[in-house]
């Protein structure tokens, strides 16, 4: 996944106790998470309860996170990779194996979801589910109707066919700046395997995206949240919860902007974001304390309410705001889930092909 890049937030610093001439050592924790992906009070509430100061940085693509991890000196105690990147990072030795004796609230997690995640993390040995969601189309109802008329917004054709994009360009279109999100969607739209290894398939997806490239206002994986909410763009390829946040911001602003989200009828990506402890973490015990804190139903319920993403704890759903817990955009019905695909761990050769293809699409070279 997702999910605005900001400066490091030093949250809820507490005065350290002085014992005679010796100052007690501060307990600290360094977290690297997706943009707009936690409730406003979560960190300060944790600090108040635990006495652990939290330093919090954000990113908006798995590629950015991977760059930190590959260096071997991430500087973080908790990071939040998506499921399709997790397997590769585990194989590279990027994470510590979990000590589940330090996670008493592990019992609160959904066993069925844990089983799904074993594709990337056999035995659930390295990562803890945080939130999950889908990719789809976020759009400004009035502006899109203005340029497309009564055409239903229910297909990837809205974004992947030039005749539609040419019209939408008048009010602004945002695509994610992430080949591992955009290319599988185009492959799936073409009826091809979104996890294909075949270069010929990627060539077909490249052709689709290259044809609509002239009509894309920009490529960014989080800017579209505020731009949808403000009416600066009318449509975006986006994460479900990010569009939910845009809709909430638009409603709060009271300017009559109605933002909706749709999972196209052809299907879309179902993804999971997970908490993991980097191999070079210096405060692993504090990381366990925070992860276990987030495994409390009442804590993760507030996070889901704020960010608009589903969580992995069944006991949290009754505690959530009905507008979130009952939303089919957040918790899709089974008929929709059946059409979704989960991104697989791809070999390095295919990932390089994805990267080269995406660079050509973006630059037109």
From Swiss-Prot:
Disruption phenotype: Significant decrease in T3SS induction. It holds the Pfam family SBP_bac_8. Spermidine binds at residues 35, 181, 242, 269. The keyword Transport applies. It is found in: Periplasm. Keywords: Periplasm, Signal, Transport, Virulence. One of its GO terms (cellular component) is periplasmic space. Changing residue 271 to F: Increases affinity for putrescine (to KD=1.12 uM). One of its GO terms (biological process) is polyamine transport. The keyword Transport applies. One of its GO terms (molecular function) is spermidine binding. Residues 1-24 form the signal peptide. PANTHER family: NORSPERMIDINE SENSOR, SPERMIDINE/PUTRESCINE-BINDING PERIPLASMIC PROTEIN. Spermidine-binding protein probably required for its uptake into cells. Binds spermidine with high affinity (KD=14.3 nM). Does not bind putrescine, cadaverine or spermine. Spermidine binding induces large inter-domain conformational changes. Implicated in induction of type 3 secretion systems (T3SS), which play a role in virulence. Belongs to the bacterial solute-binding protein PotD/PotF family. This is Spermidine-binding periplasmic protein SpuE. It comes from Pseudomonas aeruginosa (strain ATCC 15692 / DSM 22644 / CIP 104116 / JCM 14847 / LMG 12228 / 1C / PRS 101 / PAO1).
């Amino acid at each position: 996944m997702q999910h605005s890049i900001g400066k490091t937030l030093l949250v809820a610093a507490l005065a350290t106790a002085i014992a005679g001439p010796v100052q007690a050592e501060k307990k600290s924790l360094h977290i690297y998470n997706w943009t707009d992906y936690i409730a406003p009070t979560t960190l300060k509430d944790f600090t108040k309860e635990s006495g652990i100061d939290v330093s919090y940085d954000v990113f908006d693509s798995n590629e950015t996170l991977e760059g930190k991890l590959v260096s071997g000196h991430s500087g973080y105690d908790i990071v939040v990779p998506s499921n399709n990147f997790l397997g590769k990072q585990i194989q590279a030795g990027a994470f510590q194996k979990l000590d589940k004796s330090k996670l008493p609230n592990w019992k609160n997690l959904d066993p069925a979801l844990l089983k799904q995640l074993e594709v990337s993390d056999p035995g659930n040995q390295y990562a803890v589910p945080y939130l999950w969601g889908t990719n789809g189309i976020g759009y400004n109802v009035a502006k899109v109707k203005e340029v497309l008329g009564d055409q239903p917004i229910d297909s990837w054709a809205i974004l992947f066919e030039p005749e539609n994009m040419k019209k939408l360009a008048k009010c602004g279109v945002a695509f994610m700046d992430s080949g591992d999100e955009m290319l599988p969607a185009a492959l799936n739209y073409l009826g091809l395997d979104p996890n294909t290894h075949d270069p010929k398939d990627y060539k077909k997806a490249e052709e689709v995206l290259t044809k609509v490239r002239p009509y894309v206002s920009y490529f960014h994986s989080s800017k579209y949240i505020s731009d949808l909410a403000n009416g600066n763009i009318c449509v975006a390829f986006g994460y479900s919860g990010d569009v939910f946040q845009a809709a909430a911001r638009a409603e709060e602003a009271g300017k009559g902007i109605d933002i909706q989200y749709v999972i196209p009828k052809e299907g879309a990506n179902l993804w999971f974001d997970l908490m993991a402890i980097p191999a070079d973490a210096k405060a692993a015990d504090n990381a366990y304390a925070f992860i276990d804190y987030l495994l409390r139903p009442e804590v993760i319920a507030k996070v889901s309410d704020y960010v608009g993403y589903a969580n992995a704890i069944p006991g949290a759903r009754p505690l959530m705001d009905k507008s979130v817990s009952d939303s089919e955009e957040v918790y899709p019905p089974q008929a929709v889930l059946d059409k979704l695909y989960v991104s697989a761990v791809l070999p390095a050769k295919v990932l390089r092909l994805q990267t080269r293809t995406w660079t050509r699409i973006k630059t037109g070279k």
